[in-house]
Each structure stands twice: as structure tokens, then as C-alpha cells.
């Protein structure tokens, strides 16, 4: 798929501050007169997204094949493919809070360990091959230890898809650890940049502004105008 824009995905386990960094990065780019489309997944108001919300709320029960849920998440992105591709073709910078890697990390973590590599390839073929979703130019991985991330999730405001402080994945620390391990492996890819968001010396999250400066520095090679002196 030929595009002239750039696609930047902000990834990380729940509670890593993705939404905040998408907002700050969008503001930083727009302040430099760049056209930006910011979005995020799941889109809980889409046809597939509503089913994702039901899954996360536990409406489908505790046990289901991860192929089923991977299809839901991929379908949610497919429903939003049009605006993303259009923005890229117009030369815009698309920044998304979660993208394909979230499916790879969270759903692969729910599969049996001996089949995880095969399942990862299956998801990538589904999203990039079957659905034709554009591939990321850059993935920003906001890395946070699962135990700290889980406590941060509990501080979130009430979300539309669940009345609980944690959805069924957020409440499972073993799942979060497995997903974090998969993210760590994915982060070895050349188009990924890992940003450590937790400071073990202070036993707390780094300030959002400090993280945002590191995020912007990681984006600079992708967007030449950011390298110009102001």
C-alpha cells in the first residue's frame, strides 16, 4: 500500500499512559503546523468494538478461543481502515493508541506457549494481509512493570464498557505479565522504540512531560521538520 504519510502506534500494557502520550505527541506535532489524525483502539462504538467491550466485561464467559477475540480486535481496526488510509495518502501523521501489536501481545498471551509464534504470524496475516491494514512506520513501546501498571488501571475513571475497576484482562496479573513479555520480544524489531516509563529509583512513574520529550525525540527521524531549528 503506497502512502506518503506516517503511521505511529503507541503501545504498552494497560496503565502505561498511552492515551496521555498520544495527546501530547499530537499537540507537539500540530504546534509545528503538521496535519495529525489521532485515534485509538478498541473503538467501542463500532460494530466489532461493541463486541470487544462485551468480551472485556466478561459477557462471553471466562473461556473462549483467542482466535475469536483476535478476530474481534482485528475487525474493529478494519472498520476504521478507510479514514486511516485516507489520512496517510494525504500526507498526514496518524497516531494511534494501540494498533496491531496490542492484538499480538494480548491475544498471543492467551494462547498455549508452544503455539504462540504460529498464532502471532496468524494475527499478522489477518490484520496486514487479509484486512490490508497499513503497517506502522514507528511503534513507541511505553514499558511499565505489570504490577505497577495494574495499580494505575485501578485509578482510571469509569469506562463505558464495564462498571468494574479492571476488565477481565486487566484483573489477571499473569496475563499482563505474559503480554508484557511478548511486547518485550516484539520491541526487538527495527521499527520499535522502547521508552521506560517507570523509575525504579523513585518507585513511581516518570513525569508525563519527561516521557513526552523522549517520545518526540524518537519521532524526529521520521518527521524531518522536527529536526529543523526553531
Sequence positions of predicted segments:
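Conserved lysine of the Walker
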Residues: 18
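P-loop (Walker A) phosphate-binding loop of NTP-binding proteins
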Residues: 13
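Pre-Walker A (Motif I) flank of P-loop NTPase domains
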Residues: 3-7
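Hydrophobic anchor at the beta1->P-loop junction of P-loop NTPases
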Residues: 10
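ATP-dependent small-molecule kinase phosphotransfer cores
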Residues: 32-131
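Hydrophobic positions on the alpha1 helix immediately C-terminal to the Walker A/P-loop
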Residues: 21
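NTP-dependent small-molecule kinase module
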Residues: 26, 147-230
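A glycine- and Lys/Arg-enriched "phosphate-lid" helix/loop adjacent to the NTP-binding pocket
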Residues: 101-181
Amino acid at each position: 500500500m503506497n502512502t506518503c504519510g506516517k503511521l505511529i502506534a503507541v503501545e504498552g500494557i494497560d496503565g502505561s499512559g498511552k492515551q496521555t502520550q498520544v495527546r501530547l505527541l499530537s499537540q507537539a506535532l500540530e504546534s509545528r503546523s503538521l496535519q495529525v489524525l489521532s485515534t485509538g483502539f478498541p473503538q467501542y462504538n463500532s460494530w466489532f468494538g461493541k463486541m470487544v467491550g462485551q468480551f472485556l466485561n466478561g459477557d462471553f464467559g471466562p473461556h473462549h478461543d483467542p482466535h475469536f477475540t483476535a478476530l474481534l480486535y482485528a475487525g474493529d481496526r478494519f472498520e476504521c481502515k478507510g479514514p486511516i488510509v485516507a489520512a496517510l495518502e494525504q500526507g498526514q501523521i496518524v497516531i494511534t493508541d494501540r494498533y496491531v501489536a496490542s492484538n499480538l501481545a494480548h491475544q498471543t498471551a492467551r494462547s498455549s506457549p508452544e503455539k504462540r509464534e504460529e498464532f502471532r504470524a496468524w494475527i499478522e496475516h489477518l490484520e496486514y494481509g487479509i484486512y490490508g491494514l497499513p503497517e506502522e512506520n514507528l511503534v513507541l513501546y511505553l514499558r511499565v512493570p505489570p504490577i505497577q501498571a495494574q495499580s494505575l488501571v485501578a485509578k482510571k475513571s469509569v469506562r463505558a464498557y464495564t462498571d468494574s475497576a479492571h476488565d477481565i484482562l486487566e484483573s489477571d496479573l499473569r496475563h499482563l505479565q505474559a503480554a508484557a513479555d511478548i511486547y518485550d520480544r516484539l520491541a526487538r524489531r527495527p521499527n520499535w522504540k522502547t521508552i521506560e516509563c517507570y523509575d525504579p529509583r523513585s518507585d513511581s512513574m516518570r513525569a508525563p512531560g519527561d516521557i513526552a520529550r523522549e517520545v518526540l525525540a524518537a519521532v524526529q527521524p521520521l518527521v524531518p521538520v522536527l529536526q529543523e531549528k526553531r
